[in-house]
Amino acid sequence: MGSGDGSILINSIIGLALFAAAYSLWGGLAAVAWTDVVQVIVLIFGGLMMTYFALVNLGDGGSAIDGLKYVYETVPERFSMILSKGEIITPNGNDAWFDLPGLAVLIGGMWVANLYYWGFNQYIIQRTLAAKSLEEGQKGIAFAAFLKLLIPIFVVLPGIIVYVMNLDASGALAVSSLDQGFIGENGAIINDNAAPWLIKEIIPVGLKGLILAALAAAIVSSLASMVNSTSTIFTMDIYKSIINKKADDKSLVKVGRIAGLVALIVAILIAPQLKSLGQVFQYIQEYTGVVSPGILAVFLMGLFYKKASNNGAIWGVISSIPIAMYFKVGPNGWSSLSIFNHDIPFMNQMLITCLATMFIIFVVSKIEGNQDDPKGIVITKKLFSTSPTFNLSLIHISEPTRPID
C-alpha cells in the first residue's frame, strides 16, 4: 500500500522500467517479440474478463449480454463516434467534440494519426520488418488488425460501464458521491482511474491479480518496444551514420544499450509529472500530432509523387513543426477563417498540418525543376501485392458489425 506521498507510483515506475530493460536491452527485438506473445495473451484474457464481470454485475443477475443492453439503453450517446459540437459535455465540462470532431473522425485527421502510427512509426513497423518474409509480415499485420477490433471491448467499454455505475437517479453523473480516487488535486475528474476502480469494486479476488498483471504487461510491452526503437534509431541513424561510420557490430550493440538506458532514465524522470494531465493517452496523441503530420507527408509524397525532391522533403518536415505549433500557441484573430484559430480539435490540426506540408514539398520540388530522382523507389503493382490469405483476412475484419438488438 502507498503512504500517500506518491512513493508507490515511483516504485512502480522504477520496477516496470527495470523489468522492461532486463530483456529489451540485452535480448533485443527477438526477446521483445517473444515476450509480447505471452503478454498479449494475458492482456486480452484479463481485459475480456474485466469487461465480462462488469457487464454481468450490471445485468442484475442476468448475462453479460443483458448488461451490455442495459448500458446501451442507459447511455446510447456514449456509443456514438460522430459527434456534433456541444452534443456531449464531459464530466470536467469539456466538449467531447474536440476529441471526436464529427466527420473528421472518418475523413480527417484520424487518418493522419493512424497512417503515421501503423505505417511509418519505427515503434510499430520494426516487428513487420523483422518478419521472415513479406507474406509472414502481412499475416502479422492482418492478425494485429483483428486484435485491434477487440480493443473497444476491454478498453472503451469498461469506461462507459464505470460512467453508468456512477449515475444518479436522474441519469446525471453523481459527482458528489464519486470515489476519491477519481478526484484530482485540482478537483478535476481523472478518467484514467476508471479501470483501477472497476477492478477494485467488481472483479473477484482471484482474478484481480491476473488483470493487474495484464495491465502491467501492456505497460511493459509498450515500454520495451519503445526502448528498442529508440536505441535502434539512435545507433543506426545517428551514431553509425554521423558519429562513427566505421563502428563494428560490438560497438553498435554497446551504444544501443547505453542509448536505451538513457531513454529509460529520462522516461522515469518524466513519468511522475504526467499524473496531473488527466487523460495521458489523449495528451500523448495530441502532442505526437505536432511531428507526425510532417513525417507522414514526407513518406506519402516520396511514395506517390515521383518528382518529389530531397530539399522538398527537408523543407516540408522543417516547416511542419512551426505550422503545428501555431495551433498550440499561436494568437487568435489575425484571420476570420476558422482554420487559423488554434482552438480547434487536434485531429483537424493534424490534417491541416499534413496538407500544408505536402503543399510545401510540392512547391519546393516544382521550383527545383521536378527532376526524377534516379535513386528513388520505383512504384509497381508488385510492390503493393498481397497474398490471398491477407486479402481474405481484411475482408472479414472490415465487415460491418450488427447493432445491439
Show the residue positions of the predicted features.
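Membrane-embedded helix-loop-helix hairpins and adjacent transmembrane boundary segments
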Residues: M1-L394, S398, R402
